[in-house]
């Protein structure tokens, strides 16, 4: 199987551009197609994350899940050479992403949008009038936290847009605007919400969550309420403090099996719609990592 991809350039690279791209050798880039020869316009995330648009990270997650991922191998004055990432093959990738997150010898890495700012992830090729926007590759636990905060920030932004007094955006930014990892603090580039439902996919996902809350079968809530009051279970002990007080105030005496069945069907449909995103796009399993060379041995999960 020939995994090599040649990306042809429309103009010769400037010397400083060659140096900047060579610093990224070993990093992952998305490709617009699977062809062995491609043009530079289909390289990176620039086509779904331009300077002129507010970032829709969910759209970028979808793109990363559907595109061809490749490792940058060589940079020359008139072309770039990459190796496609396919299941069953082992790769050596470099931890040269900005901002820097420490990787570990074994575990899982998630390929995700550049959620800490486009400028950190971009190499400008003025010679070819194109920006090469790299994704981030993060340890999966921190990638999960990032996604949680982006989605909840979108929900709060919509709440405040409808009724400014319902939430304090300073408090929202304090809790959702950054992540901490191994003693370091990282600011997220949270998207400003551009008017009613302006970020189609991110808004849709946030609405899925909001609607799903209303679709819980009433029998499920009544069972939880009864168990909390009268019985003990390890799971209940774990989640008891997180069950909202509103559950106790909902009228659950008049149960309808037919209504609950409809709720269950729609809720399961929503869950299936969300499942692909919660896999956090492409994941890499790591077998070894060298802190000296910043190189991980990994394969596509």
From Swiss-Prot:
GO molecular function: structural molecule activity
Main location: virion
InterPro entries for this protein: Herpes_capsid_2
GO cellular component, one term: viral capsid
Subcellular location: Virion; Host nucleus
Function comment: Structural component of the T=16 icosahedral capsid. The capsid is composed of pentamers and hexamers of major capsid protein/MCP, which are linked together by heterotrimers called triplexes. These triplexes are formed by a single molecule of triplex protein 1/TRX1 and two copies of triplex protein 2/TRX2. Additionally, TRX1 is required for efficient transport of TRX2 to the nucleus, which is the site of capsid assembly.
HAMAP family: HSV_TRX2
Family named by the database record: Belongs to the herpesviridae TRX2 protein family.
Protein name (Swiss-Prot/TrEMBL): Triplex capsid protein 2
Protein's organism: Epstein-Barr virus (strain B95-8) (HHV-4)
């Amino acid at each position: 199987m020939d995994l090599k991809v040649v990306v042809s350039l429309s103009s010769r690279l400037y010397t400083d551009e060659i140096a900047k791209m060579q610093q990224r050798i070993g990093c992952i880039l998305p490709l617009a197609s699977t062809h062995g020869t491609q043009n530079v316009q289909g390289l990176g995330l620039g086509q779904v994350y331009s300077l002129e648009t507010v970032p829709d990270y969910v759209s970028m997650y979808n793109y990363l899940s559907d595109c061809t991922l490749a490792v940058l191998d060589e940079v020359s004055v008139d072309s770039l050479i990459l190796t496609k990432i396919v299941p069953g093959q082992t790769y050596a990738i470099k931890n040269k992403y900005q901002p820097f997150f420490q990787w570990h010898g074994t575990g899982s890495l998630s390929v995700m949008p550049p959620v800490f700012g486009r400028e950190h992830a971009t190499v400008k090729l003025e010679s070819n009038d194109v920006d090469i926007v790299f994704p981030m590759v993060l340890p999966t636990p921190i990638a999960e936290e990032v996604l949680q905060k982006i989605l909840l920030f979108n929900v709060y932004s919509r709440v405040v847009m409808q009724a400014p007094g319902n939430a304090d955006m300073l408090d929202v930014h304090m809790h959702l605007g950054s992540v901490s990892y191994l003693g370091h603090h990282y600011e997220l580039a949270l998207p400003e919400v551009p008017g009613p439902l302006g970020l189609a996919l991110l808004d849709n996902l946030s609405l899925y969550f909001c609607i799903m809350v209303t679709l819980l079968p009433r029998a499920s809530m009544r069972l939880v309420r009864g168990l909390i009051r009268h019985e003990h279970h390890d799971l209940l002990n774990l989640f008891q403090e997180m069950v909202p007080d509103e559950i106790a105030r909902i009228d659950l005496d008049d149960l309808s099996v037919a209504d609950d069945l409809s709720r269950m069907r729609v809720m399961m449909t929503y869950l299936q719609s969300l499942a692909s995103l919660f896999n956090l796009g492409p994941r890499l399993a790591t077998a070894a990592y060298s802190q000296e060379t910043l190189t991980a041995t990994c394969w596509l999960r």
